[in-house]
Amino acid sequence: MKREVIHAPGVPAPLAHYCQGVVAGDTIYAAGQIASDYRTSVPAEARVDPAFPYYGSEIQRQTRYILENIRKTFQAAGADLADVVKAQVFLTDLADFFHFDQVWKEFFPSPPPRTTVQISGLLVPGCRVEIDLVGVRRHVKREVIRADGVPAPLAHYCQGVIVGDTIYAAGQIASDYRTGVPAEARVDPAFPYYGSDIQRQTRYILENIRRTFRAAGADLADVVKAQVFLTDLTDFFHFDQVWKEFFPSPPPRTTVQVSGLLVPGCRVEIDLIGVGRHVKREVIRADGVPAPLAHYCQGVVAGDTIYAAGQIASNYRTGVPAEARVDPAFPYYGSDIERQTRYILENVRKTFQAAGADLADVVKAQVFLTDLRDFFYFDQVWKEFFPSPPPRTTVQVSGLLVPGCRVEIDLVAVRG
């Protein structure tokens, strides 16, 4: 499939090793953007004048700055923000959300599906939000999904969109948007030892997302990519038991801990991508890649698109293996983050090669670091594996599923 790197005039050039965006076929994958010009940190037009602190909103200025830049990126690809079909929003403080959403409405009169979580840090101090968008060219047919029985969101987004053969669903949490977490998604406080909040919430969410997929002429068996945002990783094992009920043949999955979700009491947000039932897909089984302990697969090929599971530096036998960590007897002779990044990318490369592709075919990358101070050293290894880098989103999260792991990498590729 034909790929083209986007070079949009007027958009700040990144300091790190990634590109503004890639067009693969008719799909536009944009890099996550923050409100920085990469010269002066947060530029004057994206912040409130400290001499007049009550005459403006930082989050609104930053959101507007970002969306104006992303619009230029999409326009350079022959599209516009009206062509966005999936959005992910990473806020450093959920108290900013309401004011963020007011600006979102200005740019998206007909909004795309969206996932919003709170993360613990962004790469430029003072930045309050990172926005990650996927779109399509203007001529591509799309249809908004309206599923009966699924709670209508309070905020400005839709349940999902069908774009050609792909189904993009909004991230869902266990809320009816009337009472917070509804009774059926929580344990009765009078009987606290007779149930599991995370299992009830997971079941509530997946039943709703199943309705969304069925309204699109598909089902959960047609999911080809999952991202799971937990507020507490100690919930993971019990979450995964419910996941097995809904996904006998599981999709690739990325799981990270975030620091907050938009409704108090919600413990998990689930973000899914699917394809139409007629689309040929194949589960990837790559030799030499550690078999996961949990219920997901290494990756799926759907049409020409390859969705890989998020990977961390674990062999799932000994935690972080020796080759992915510095010998504690020689702590100053190596870098944990560089070793972990190399370990992960070598494994992901095997996954892509088993699917008839390579890292040169990656069109979208998301990087979840547990400590942003690792970023510079991470990026040095990234350059080795990606001489011509894909668009990338990088955020700091609160935790990963194996203690000692410092980064999770989530990649999507398109076969050439």
What would you call each of these model-derived segments?
Residues 1-68, 72-85, 90-207, 211-225, ...:
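N-terminal presequence-like segments and the immediate start of the first folded domain
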